């Protein structure tokens, strides 16, 4: 009997945020509706942060990034969704996609309904689910014991925080929990470690689902050095240990990383180490190379 391929899987789930999750989803977009992204909603910077401070609600920026990278049919709607205002006025720097998502959120019963409306408008087949449908922020305790509030401030810490948490305590989106329960393969990363990857793992229901799932789990490492000082100081082993500390169990079966990553201390896990860089932007994953590496990981995991 041949090993399974990605095309054989009924449910592939990827967790994270920022440009990293969008890149993973776009590399697997051939899976269509069998692909689900669980998206971080704690961003408090840029256009997203301004909207949250003014209007409240969840952070839409990471969701917009994922939708942008999943658009395969250019249209007036997609051009509008990707448009960013210039100039010096009140709208300067705002992304119209963020405003569209926020407007639909006001018109919908749930944020997930707003996302599905936009998915249909943009003809995006992959499922996208916010990690929580309630407003939440990332908080850290620094090495002096001080509370540091928000992703922007946490990324500016000089050293790794003692602890990270979500505030307030919010429930995970029930569809996100169900997606993990039903998954045949789970992917985490790439992305900014503290602010894109960890928030999903800090939700109790998602961590519990990750502890219980029998699905193989793969961590995809970054290709470039993190701009966040505290995250940049972490080794691959540090990151694996921290993720599993918050999940509560050793669950990551494989890592997919570039050739410059030190994997010498990674034990008892499958390591797929290959050239993954895109030719135009070296710190981004080439979609086909990433797809091939994930295929290789799945084959090796059996």
Curated annotation (Swiss-Prot):
Q: What does this gene product do?
A: Required for morphogenesis under gluconeogenic growth conditions.
User: By which gene is this protein encoded?
Assistant: ybhK
Q: Which Pfam families match?
A: CofD
Return one GO MF term: LPPG:FO 2-phospho-L-lactate transferase activity
Major place of localization?
cytoplasm
Family from the record: Belongs to the gluconeogenesis factor family.
Recorded hits in InterPro entries, A to Z, give: CofD (IPR002882), CofD-like_dom_sf (IPR038136), Gluconeogen_factor (IPR010119)
HAMAP family under this entry?
Answer: Gluconeogen_factor (MF_00973)
**Where in the cell is the protein located?**
Cytoplasm
Q: Which GO terms describe its cellular component?
A: cytoplasm
Q: Which positions make up the signal peptide?
A: none
- Gene3D superfamilies attached here? CofD-like domains
What PANTHER family does this protein's entry cite?
GLUCONEOGENESIS FACTOR-RELATED, UNCHARACTERIZED PROTEIN YVCK-RELATED
* Organism (species): Salmonella typhimurium (strain LT2 / SGSC1412 / ATCC 700720)
KW Cytoplasm (keyword) present:
yes
Q: What is this protein called?
A: Putative gluconeogenesis factor
Q: Which NCBIfam families match?
A: CofD_related (TIGR01826)
Q: Give each disulfide bond as a residue pair.
A: none
Mitochondrion among the record's keywords?
no
One GO biological process term is: regulation of cell shape
Alphabetical keyword list: Cytoplasm
């Amino acid at each position: 009997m041949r090993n399974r391929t990605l095309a054989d899987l009924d449910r592939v789930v990827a967790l994270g945020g920022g440009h990293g999750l969008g890149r993973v989803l776009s590399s697997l977009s051939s899976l269509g509706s069998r692909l689900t992204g669980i998206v971080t909603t704690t961003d408090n910077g840029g256009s997203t942060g301004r909207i949250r401070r003014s209007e409240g609600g969840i952070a839409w920026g990471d969701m917009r990034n994922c939708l942008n990278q999943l658009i395969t049919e250019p249209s007036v709607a997609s051009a509008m969704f990707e448009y960013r205002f210039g100039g010096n006025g009140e709208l300067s720097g705002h992304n119209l996609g963020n405003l569209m998502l926020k407007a639909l959120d006001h018109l919908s019963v749930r944020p997930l309904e707003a996302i599905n409306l936009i998915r249909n408008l943009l003809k995006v087949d992959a499922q996208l689910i916010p990690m929580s449908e309630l407003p939440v922020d990332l908080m850290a305790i620094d090495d002096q014991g001080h509370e540091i509030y928000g992703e922007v401030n946490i990324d500016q810490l000089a050293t790794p925080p003692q602890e990270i948490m979500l505030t307030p305590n919010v429930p995970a989106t029930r569809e996100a929990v169900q997606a993990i329960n039903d998954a045949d393969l789970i992917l985490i990363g790439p992305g900014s470690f503290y602010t894109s990857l960890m928030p999903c793992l800090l939700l109790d229901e998602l961590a519990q689902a990750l502890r219980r799932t029998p699905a193989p789990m793969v961590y995809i490492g970054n290709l470039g050095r993190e701009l966040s000082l505290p995250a940049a100081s972490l080794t691959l082993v540090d990151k694996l240990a921290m993720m599993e500390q918050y999940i509560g169990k050793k669950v990551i079966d494989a890592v997919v990383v570039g050739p410059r990553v030190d994997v010498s201390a990674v034990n008892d896990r499958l390591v797929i180490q290959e050239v993954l860089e895109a030719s135009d932007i070296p710190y981004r994953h080439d979609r086909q190379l990433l797809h091939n590496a994930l295929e290789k990981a799945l084959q090796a995991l059996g």
